[in-house]
Amino acid sequence: SWRPTGAGSSTRGGDDVLALLPLHTALMAARALADRFREAMAPFGREGRAPSLSVGLAVVHHLEPLQDALDLARRAEKWAKEGEPKRNALCVAYSPRSGAERLVRGRWDENPPLTRRLLRYADLLRAGEVPSRAAYELLALVREAGEALPGEALVAEALRILGRKEMKRAYREE
């Protein structure tokens, strides 16, 4: 059986798995689970369709009631399954101690994958290479114009916002 390294608890029910993990290992554990699932299930695919894995990951404050954390994880898993395109995705839900929840979703077959993008962003934040306010400005852009603008225009506006920030050009384009 698969058990993530450092998991405080791991339970299975039907085809659902629940693991409690330290924040610094959760994304890598989710990626490792997806890779292992893909390898193990590859022989069982039909007509070029492999079985899918949808993962909901909840990041909560340590004082958050466990039931609330579990509810958030279930909502994240549901969005991973039901977002477009459906299934085979990771949804990370973040609930700060105060403020609104944030959700981000990406499919396992995206390039670069969501896990890599989030880990890279965290590295850049820790190194002070990306201003922390940049994420809030990009979130505001998506909320205000996300549906109204075509993808290319949205990316161009995001690059314009990042272009105003004091950061190396390579990080802006990443």
Region roles according to the model:
Residues 1-174:
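Charged, helix-rich terminal subdomains or tails
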